[in-house]
Amino acid sequence: MNRLCVVLPAKDECLGISKTLRSILNAGVMQSDVYVIDDGSTDGTGEIAASFGVNVVRNSQNIGKARSLQQLAAISELPRRYSYICLMDADTEVSTEYFRVVKLALGRPGVAAVCGRAKSAPHNWLTAYRCLAYWISHSIYKDGQSNMGVITVTPGCASSFRAEVFQQLEWSTDTIVEDMDCTVQIHRRRLGKIVYHKKALVSTQDPSTLRDYIKQMYRWNTGAWQIGMKYGMFGGVSKIDWEYKLLMGEGLVFGVLFLMLPVWAAISPRIALYGVAMDSAVLMLLSLLCAISDRRADVLFASPLYGLVRFIDCSVFLYSFWNTVVQRKRVRGWFAVKRY
């Protein structure tokens, strides 16, 4: 058996779910192998999905992505009927080669999960910055993490699992980043390798307003700190623990240094100026490389505004650390990014 299915949780996604389903079907997946979880939508999302002839599982009320997946895993026989299970977000459009690449990767011995490469759909200067952030993450970090076996998160918009691995995952609701939670579970339980494949390409809609961007970054960062505390990664000594500490520690150090620029400027204006000039030059170079690689001229044109977003990134990262790790505040819930 070498069958593959797609599971697509959706809540009020009438604007984008048609494009998502069309791309999945155009990539070669049969209608009978697509499962949409209509999580209490009130905008006709389930009806739109049903019009494509796919399977629609309806929740009478909104219970969230993690609980929806948990419920589906408990009541369905998907792990028995399929070899591979792919998770998608309702704003994701897959490339025509996506599922072929995923099947080949999951068919290798010892591979438990595959994460694809996400690209931000062009819309405005903020999505151009997210395009750059994704490019840096996938071009610099993900390949190295894959080779060393320390991928920290398989993104929810492009994650695929062996069915027997999917069946063993706990879709917990005690953290707000179910994709990272499941990734660390695979490492902790030694369920197999997690590999990154850049040809498993998807396009996703990212926040187009600063308000939505800040909310999303706060959720991601808070969730990452929650994962560290849940799995004892601050004091762990495995490879994934060290990678986690390296990434989060880097974020803390850079965040503090970046936000202290006004202080450095008051103490030593010349040193502060050199630091800003060097940082801007590196960011401009990366923007140019990303613009060429992804054929996104908007990434380069919007680069003068990236300093503002980096200030926001650092502020939100440190704020989430303070709330989650220092004050131990419990954060739950999710919000919907405005679609376009």
Functional labels for PLM-detected ranges:
Residues 15-19, 43-51, 97:
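Acidic helix N-cap motif at the loop->helix transition within catalytic regions
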Residues 106, 110-138, 173-176, 180-244, ...:
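Catalytic donor/gating beta->alpha subdomain of glycosyltransferases that bind UDP-sugars
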Residues 250-329:
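Membrane-embedded multi-pass helical conduit in multi-pass membrane proteins
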Residues 12-26:
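Short, well-formed alpha-helical segments that are part of the catalytic scaffolds
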Residues 23, 30, 38-46, 61, ...:
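A conserved acidic beta->alpha catalytic loop
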Residues 32-35, 46-75, 116-117:
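Conserved donor nucleotide-binding strand/loop of the catalytic core
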